[in-house]
């Protein structure tokens, strides 16, 4: 544990999910593979559909709806819906197909192997402070055993713009009824988590990714209050 700024009073903790509480890389790789297979098998006209086609459609959807990137679930839905429209399905069929694809996506997205260390750490921390999850993604903690640790979960899109925008940080403080400066946000991303939290008035803990090096960042404004390499280190703050 390394300290870079004076750590003040802590009345609550907020957490990023992906790559902070578990390794999200294998989850996403498997989910994207299964999601593509589902779309390809959904209709004969989509048999040759590839991830490159999805990326092209995602870009087109974002150009038409610039703010949609804040809601990754809606963005994916609209992209798949457009793929089905392009394949010749009716508007009703495309909407139904996109909904089915998203149900399949959510199923695979929630098959996450959470380390026991994460469970043990969150359990201890939750005895001391209220915990909140703040995510730009579409993981659902209640589906992979983490839901009970959190007072609530905030997701970009339904609860505001994505991090590093301040919407969800401000909303967390409001819902917790805690001064924002007394909240410690924990995350792996120096921009969305550390930078976003600090610019919103929170304290920030950077959980350093493998091979991460704070000294390689060019933006000194991203300096966290503290840096850890293991989630369990947070229990020393109790």
UniProtKB/Swiss-Prot annotation:
Q: How does activity depend on pH?
A: Optimum pH is 6-7.5.
Q: Which Pfam families match?
A: Hydrolase
Obligatory cofactor(s) = Mg(2+); Mn(2+); Co(2+); Zn(2+)
The metabolic or biological pathway listed in the UniProt record of this protein is: Cofactor biosynthesis; riboflavin biosynthesis; 5-amino-6-(D-ribitylamino)uracil from GTP: step 4/4
Any idea which residues are catalytic in this one? 16 (nucleophile)
In Gene Ontology terms, what is a biological process of this protein?
A: riboflavin biosynthetic process
Task: Provide the binding site for substrate.
Answer: 16-18
Asked whether the keyword Metal-binding is assigned, the reply is yes
The EC number(s) this enzyme carries: 3.1.3.104
| Function description | Catalyzes the dephosphorylation of 5-amino-6-(5-phospho-D-ribitylamino)uracil, and thus could be involved in the riboflavin biosynthesis pathway. Is also able to dephosphorylate flavin mononucleotide (FMN) and other phosphoric acid esters. YigB is important for the formation of dormant persister cells.
Gene field = yigB
* GO molecular-function terms, A-Z: 5-amino-6-(5-phosphoribitylamino)uracil phosphatase activity; magnesium ion binding; phosphatase activity
Signal peptide: which range, if any? Answer: none
Q: Which organism is it from?
A: Escherichia coli (strain K12)
The protein's name in its UniProt record: 5-amino-6-(5-phospho-D-ribitylamino)uracil phosphatase YigB
Q: Which family does it belong to?
A: Belongs to the HAD-like hydrolase superfamily.
The reaction(s) annotated as catalysed by this protein in its Swiss-Prot or TrEMBL entry are: 5-amino-6-(5-phospho-D-ribitylamino)uracil + H2O = 5-amino-6-(D-ribitylamino)uracil + phosphate
> What keywords were assigned to this record?
Hydrolase, Magnesium, Metal-binding
Query: Binding positions for Mg(2+)?
Result: 16, 18, 188
Concerning InterPro entries, the annotation shows: HAD-like_hydrolase, HAD-like_sf, HAD-SF_hydro_IA, HAD_sf
Effect of gene knockout:
Cells lacking this gene can grow in the absence of exogenous riboflavin; this may be due to the presence of the functionally redundant protein YbjI.
Question: How is the co-factor bound, per the entry?
Answer: Magnesium. Can also use other divalent metal cations as manganese, cobalt or zinc.
């Amino acid at each position: 544990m390394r300290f870079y700024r004076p750590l003040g009073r802590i009345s609550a903790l907020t957490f990023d999910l992906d790559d902070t509480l578990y390794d999200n890389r294998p989850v996403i790789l498997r989910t994207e593979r299964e999601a593509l297979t589902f779309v390809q098998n959904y209709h004969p006209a989509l048999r040759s559909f590839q991830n490159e086609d999805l990326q092209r459609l995602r870009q087109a959807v974002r150009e038409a709806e610039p703010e949609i990137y804040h809601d990754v679930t809606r963005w994916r839905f609209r992209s798949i819906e457009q793929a089905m429209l392009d394949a010749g399905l009716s508007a009703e069929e495309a909407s139904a197909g996109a909904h089915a694809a998203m149900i399949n996506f959510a199923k695979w997205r929630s098959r996450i192997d959470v380390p026991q260390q994460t469970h043990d750490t969150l359990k201890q921390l939750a005895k001391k402070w209220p915990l909140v999850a703040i995510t730009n993604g579409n993981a659902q903690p209640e589906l992979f055993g983490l839901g009970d640790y959190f007072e609530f979960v905030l997701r970009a899109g339904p609860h505001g713009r994505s991090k590093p925008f301040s919407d969800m940080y401000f909303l967390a403080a409001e819902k917790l009824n805690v001064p924002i400066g007394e909240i410690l946000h924990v995350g792996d991303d120096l921009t969305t988590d550390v930078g976003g939290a600090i610019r919103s008035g929170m304290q920030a803990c950077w959980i350093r990714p493998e091979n991460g090096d704070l000294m390689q960042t060019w933006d000194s404004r991203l300096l966290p209050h503290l840096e850890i390499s293991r989630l369990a280190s947070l229990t020393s703050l109790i």
